[in-house]
Design a protein with these regions (language model features):
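Alpha-helical transmembrane segments of multipass membrane proteins
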Residues: 11-15, 60, 64-67, 91-95, ...
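Select subsegments of transmembrane alpha-helices in polytopic membrane proteins
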Residues: 50-63
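Membrane interfacial helix motifs at helix-loop boundaries and amphipathic/re-entrant anchors
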Residues: 1-3, 33-36, 53-56, 69-85
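Membrane-water interface of transmembrane alpha-helices
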Residues: 16-34, 100-109
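Alpha-helical transmembrane segments and their immediate juxtamembrane interface regions
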Residues: 81-118
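Alpha-helical transmembrane segments
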Residues: 1-18, 87-92
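Cysteine-cluster motifs in flexible loop/terminal segments that predominantly coordinate metals
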Residues: 112-131
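Short membrane-interface loop/juxtamembrane segments of multi-pass integral membrane proteins
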Residues: 37-53
Length: 131
């Protein structure tokens, strides 16, 4: 039962850390954060999207940690399981809401202008353009 209550605590700490990195604009584009077509258009869109999603994500992590602590102090096994499940559902809902907000913020960022060709006929310009 002790291990069940630790699940939202550990997940909450990880989610809080990710939200904090996004909010402080320190999250790198290597697999974490809001990863939608809109946020992956440019580095600026990724930065803005994850900054907007940062605060709801931090709150989601705190909800997970609080739910885990509540589960640890519950006198019954059923109370521990209920506290854990409520915390996990709340954490998931807040992370999803933060992702939607981040996606919408990234949509507001202008799409990058395709890189121009210097006329060298090297054939590499298509690799420089991001559609």
């Amino acid at each position: 039962v002790f291990a069940v209550a630790l699940v939202p605590v550990v997940l909450g700490l990880v989610v809080t850390w990710g939200g904090l990195l996004g909010w402080r604009e320190k999250l790198s584009d290597r697999g974490a954060g809001v990863r939608t077509e809109a946020t992956l258009r440019s580095a600026e869109a990724f930065r803005i999207g994850n900054k907007v999603a940062g605060l709801p994500t931090i709150v989601a992590g705190v909800v997970g940690v609080v739910a885990g602590i509540a589960g640890l102090v519950m006198p019954t096994t059923a109370g521990t399981i209920v506290a854990t499940l409520v915390g996990l559902v709340g954490m998931f809902a807040l992370v999803a809401a933060g992702g939607v907000l981040g996606h919408r913020a990234a949509l507001a960022v202008r799409a990058p202008v395709p890189a121009g060709c210097s006329g060298c006929a090297c054939g590499g310009c298509s690799a420089l353009q991001k559609a």
